[in-house]
UniProtKB/Swiss-Prot annotation:
FHA domain sequence ranges: 47-102
Class in the EC hierarchy, top level: transferase
Domain named Protein kinase: residues: 162-444
KW Nucleotide-binding (keyword) present: yes
Pfam (any one): FHA
Organism domain of life: Eukaryota
Lineage: Eukaryota, Fungi, Dikarya, Ascomycota, Saccharomycotina
Presence of keyword Transit peptide: no
Catalytic residues in the record: D290 (proton acceptor)
Reaction catalyzed: L-seryl-[protein] + ATP = O-phospho-L-seryl-[protein] + ADP + H(+); L-threonyl-[protein] + ATP = O-phospho-L-threonyl-[protein] + ADP + H(+)
Protein name: Meiosis-specific serine/threonine-protein kinase MEK1
Gene: MEK1
Role description: Probable protein kinase required for meiotic recombination.
Organism: Saccharomyces cerevisiae (strain ATCC 204508 / S288c) (Baker's yeast)
Molecular function per GO: ATP binding; protein kinase activity; protein serine kinase activity; protein serine/threonine kinase activity
Length: 497
C-alpha cells in the first residue's frame, strides 16, 4: 500500500541553530488519524507541504494536494524579539486556517493551536483530509500580551482597519501590530482576513510624521507600501502598511554571533532590487539616509525572494530643488564619510547636531555608499570598515576608504563584483556611482537579461515589463547555475507505511 505521506525532517544542526529546541512544530493528521508525527519549524528554514518529494518536507500522496500546497516558516529578528510563525498558501485547491480559506500567495501569522486543513472533505470522507495543528513552545507563548492595546492606549479600530493585539515588532520607534482591512471581506467566499501591519509611533504634539508623508506618495514593489495614516488624540500616529513576513536581511545572514556570506548570484539579485528602489526614490528626489541590513525586508526567508526597503524615519524629501543635506544622521557602519560623523565625539560639542561638520553637505550618493557596505557584507560576511567594532574605528576606516580584496572571503567572488563594490565605496563622491550608473555597471549589465527574467517572473510574479515577450515557460533552466530556487532538503527522511 502506498504511504499517505513522508517527512523530510529538520536536522539536528538546524534545530541547534535555532537555539537547541524547535520553537514550534506541526502535528500531522492524515486520512482521519493522528500520525503522532511532528514537523519542527526552525528559524529561517521553510517547511513546504505538498506532493513534490524533491522540494517538500512533508510529502503527501493525495492527488488533490498541489505540488507545493503551502509553506511554513519562523522569523527571529534577534534574541530579544518574539518569534513569528507564518503560513502561505501556494495551492490550486485551497488551504484553510481554522476553517477559513486563505487567499492564494498571501501570508498569515500563526498562533498556538491553529488548525490548518489542506483539503476539506466531508466527515464521511476523512481519507481526503489532511490536518496540521500548529503548536508553539510553552516558553514562548507568555511573550504575547493580549492586553497590549488597552495598556498602551491604542485604538482598536481606525476607519476600515481593525487592529489586533498581535505584535510583529517593537522598538524605540514604537510598535508594529497585525491589522485587517474590513472592506476586503468577500460576501461570496469566506476568506480568512488578510494580514497587514500597522506601525504605531508616538509623536510630539501637532507634528505630522515625515515618514508617513513620504511613504504615502510612493508606489514601488521594492518599497514598503503604505495605505493609510491616522493620528489620534493621544498623538499616536498609525501607519497602515503591507506586512513583510520574511524577516530582515540582517537576521537572514545571521548565524549565531556572526554574519555569513551568500552566493554571488543571490547577492546580485538583491542588489538589483535595491538599485531599482533607489533609482525610483532618487528620481522622486527622496534620499533614504539609513539604508542597512536591518531595513531591508524579505517577503520569504529564501533565495530569489522579493525584498522591500523599510524604515523611512530619517528619509529626506529634497522637494525637487536638488538641495544638499547637512544633517548628521544614519548608522555609522553604513554611513558615507561626507555625511560628517566624527571619530572624536567631543568634536560635536562645538557644532549643532543639525549641521554637518563638512560644510559642503551631501547628496543622494550617500545611499549608494550604504549599498556598497551592504554588498560587501553579503559577498563576504564582513563589514568593510568595521575594524575593532567601535564607532571611532568604523568612522576612521570609512574616511580612509581602503578595501582589502586579498582576504580569502573574496577568492570566490568575481572581479566584476569587486569592481562594483569598489565603485560604490569611493570616498570621492564625484567618482562614486549613482543609482542609474549602478544599474549600468558591468556586474549588473552582464546578467541583465537573467535578472529581468527573475525580477518579473519570480519576484513580481506577473507579466509586466518590456522584455517579457521573449521569456519562455522554462525560464528556470536558463538561470545561472548558482541560483538556488528552493532550500535544500535535509538528508534525513522518514516514511510511514
Amino acid at each position: 500500500m502506498r504511504p499517505l505521506y513522508s517527512c523530510n525532517l529538520a536536522t539536528k544542526d538546524d534545530i541547534e541553530m535555532a537555539g537547541g529546541v524547535a520553537p514550534a512544530h506541526l502535528e500531522v493528521n492524515v486520512g482521519g488519524y493522528n500520525t503522532e508525527q511532528t514537523i519542527p519549524i526552525v528559524k529561517h528554514q521553510l517547511v513546504k507541504v505538498g506532493r513534490n518529494d524533491k522540494e517538500c518536507q512533508l510529502v503527501l500522496t493525495n492527488p488533490s494536494i498541489s505540488s507545493v500546497h503551502c509553506v511554513f516558516w519562523c522569523v527571529f529578528f534577534d534574541e530579544d524579539s518574539i518569534p513569528m510563525f507564518y503560513v502561505k498558501d501556494c495551492s490550486l485547491n485551497g488551504t484553510y486556517l481554522n476553517g477559513l480559506l486563505l487567499k492564494r500567495d498571501k501570508t498569515y501569522l500563526l498562533k498556538h493551536c491553529d488548525v490548518i486543513e489542506l483539503s476539506q472533505g466531508s466527515e464521511e470522507n476523512d481519507i481526503k483530509k489532511t490536518r496540521l495543528v500548529f503548536m508553539i513552545n510553552d516558553d514562548l507563548q507568555s511573550s504575547l500580551d493580549p492586553k497590549l492595546l488597552d495598556q498602551m492606549g491604542f485604538l482598536r479600530e481606525v476607519d476600515q482597519w481593525e487592529i489586533t493585539n498581535r505584535i510583529v515588532g517593537n522598538g524605540t520607534f514604537g510598535h508594529v501590530l497585525i491589522t485587517h482591512n474590513s472592506k476586503e471581506r468577500d460576501e461570496d467566499v469566506c476568506y480568512h482576513p488578510e494580514n497587514y501591519a500597522v506601525k504605531i509611533i508616538k509623536l510630539k504634539p501637532n507634528k505630522f510624521d515625515k515618514e508617513a508623508r513620504i511613504l504615502l506618495r510612493l508606489d514601488h514593489p521594492n518599497i514598503i507600501k503604505v495605505y493609510h495614516t491616522f493620528c489620534d488624540r493621544n498623538n499616536h500616529l498609525y501607519i497602515f502598511q503591507d506586512l513583510i513576513p520574511g524577516g530582515d536581511l540582517f537576521s537572514y545572514l545571521a548565524k549565531g554571533d556572526c554574519l555569513t556570506s551568500m552566493s554571488e548570484t543571490e547577492s546580485l539579485l538583491i542588489v538589483f532590487q535595491i538599485l531599482q528602489a533607489l533609482n525610483y526614490l532618487h528620481d522622486q528626489d527622496i534620499v533614504h539616509r539609513d539604508l542597512k541590513l536591518d531595513n531591508i525586508l524579505l517577503c520569504t526567508p529564501e533565495p530569489c525572494t522579493r525584498i522591500v526597503l523599510a524604515d523611512f524615519g530619517i528619509a529626506k524629501d529634497l522637494n525637487s530643488n536638488k538641495e544638499r543635506m547637512h544633517t548628521v544622521v544614519g548608522t555609522p557602519e553604513y554611513c558615507a564619510p561626507e555625511v560628517g560623523f566624527r571619530a572624536n565625539r567631543k568634536a560635536y560639542q562645538s557644532f549643532s547636531r543639525a549641521a554637518t561638520l563638512e560644510q559642503r553637505g551631501y547628496d543622494s550618493k550617500c545611499d549608494l555608499w550604504s549599498l556598497g557596505v551592504i554588498t560587501h557584507i553579503m559577498l563576504t560576511g564582513i563589514s568593510p570598515f568595521y575594524g575593532d567594532g567601535s564607532e571611532r574605528s568604523i568612522i576612521q576606516n570609512a574616511k580612509i576608504g581602503k578595501l582589502n580584496f586579498k582576504l580569502k572571503q573574496w577568492d570566490i567572488v568575481s572581479d566584476n563584483a569587486k569592481s562594483f563594490v569598489k565603485d560604490l565605496l569611493q570616498t570621492d563622491v564625484v567618482k562614486r556611482l549613482n543609482s542609474k550608473q549602478g544599474l549600468k555597471h558591468i556586474w549588473i549589465a552582464k546578467h541583465l537579461s537573467q535578472l529581468e527574467r527573475l525580477y518579473y517572473k519570480k519576484i513580481l510574479c506577473n507579466n509586466e515589463g518590456p522584455k517579457l515577450e521573449s521569456i519562455n515557460s522554462d525560464w528556470k533552466r536558463k538561470l545561472p547555475k548558482s541560483v538556488i530556487i528552493s532550500q535544500a532538503i535535509p538528508k534525513k527522511k522518514k516514511v510511514l507505511e
